[in-house]
């Protein structure tokens, strides 16, 4: 009998294949009283070391398949394993209570998980709880001599079905064999969804109970376009899904033909389509997908992948490689955005109740502790500027005085280099990321002093709606098309244009096919997104009329009260 489920369409594509249940092993154990505590400590050390090596191998594979940025999630896992305080506490329980390593590990990690999960208003700490859970499973499996599931060993075409996919699971997926995956939980912004889109594997998440309904080897039909999953599809349904898959493949082939085309609308207006990157290795994907620029280079990954602060020369080489790889096309480099969910093992960040609203990004750069790091990065960028078209962007700016302070340091380092006889490019644009509502509201004043704006919608939306996008209980409030968000964005674009400056966007919204027509109508100049979204967005823009999109955005801004009304209006104008 055919059963149909509906979930969240998290990664586009269609697949029909047998189910592969990714079941976690039984990690239950008995608490034992032991006399030889030294032996238990040695068992713990061995399990930690093996887990560390295993994670490094998984990360190395993930770098190859997903890229440096997506693979950086494993750094957080390895930091948990290397945490001397946690290890010391586990060993203290072994010695004080005379219990086996399994019991001590579970007691200490459960304590940390409970504390972090209790911080319901703090997404960063809740993510750390998820990291500890993933790591605990791995260490416990090694202590028990149990094998964890290994998606890397799959050697036939399957659709993975799981409660959820951990980052380490997703990093092992080979899209030659894994045709899609479906989970009980998760959404479009979860790690597994982001990785699925990077790998271009169809995914449907948040089905609630698919693991209870599916058996190993059962035939499934999955649409990452609509969020539909059919169990035991009929011959007719299989045919419909195959047709939908063929149509999507044909559509992708049409998009690929636009690689070297200009992004021009039906009425001849040009918009710049750019891509976001995390490392120099990502430049190849930018060029392969025909992006006209890099709209966001997240430089913090240079710091997160190092054992100590990267030197000026190390940074110079990285920036030079990116600029040269783009062959004169614009590259917007964001200065380091550490803090929040991005920590460094060699830089002591304070434990804060809410690090996303705390000491991070430019706030660190402008502090006494961060001044040296900031100046080193600016010098490296200025030296590299002669190798391409560099633009520099400061993140997390709330005050005009913050921008002035950062620009003053930039000017000082530029003057020093020139005095030293080091060549520096002329006309480097210096702008800010608009991700704090205060900056969006004061955009008219910022526009008098900056060279450009880049709107970071991921944070702007959650800060404006007072809703943590990782908290499922309030995820309904994370609304990119809410009229309040659209009005803020419009305010920023109009303020930039009033001063003869350009405005771009580098959040997820820039490649959102519902948002793009609205943003076109508002006059957004540059759209920066994941490289794999560039060609689809170019195809959409080429069939739209910019004047008609201006009518659309004007109506949405003046007449709509809800997100649903905005979506209906977009559908009416773009059908």
Curated annotation (Swiss-Prot):
InterPro entries per the UniProt record, alphabetical: PEP-util_enz_mobile_dom, PEP-utilizing_PTS_enzyme, PEP_util_AS, PEP_util_C, PEP_util_CS, Phosphohistidine_dom_sf, PTS_EI, PTS_EI-like
GO CC list: cytoplasm
Effect of disrupting the coding gene: Cells lacking this gene are unable to grow on sucrose and fructose. Severe reduction of the growth rate on glucose, galactose and maltose are observed.
Gene3D superfamilies reported for this sequence: Phosphoenolpyruvate-binding domains, Phosphohistidine domain, PtsI, HPr-binding domain
Single GO BP term: phosphoenolpyruvate-dependent sugar phosphotransferase system
Enzyme class: transferase
Protein name: Phosphoenolpyruvate-protein phosphotransferase
Organism: Lactococcus lactis subsp. cremoris
Gene: ptsI
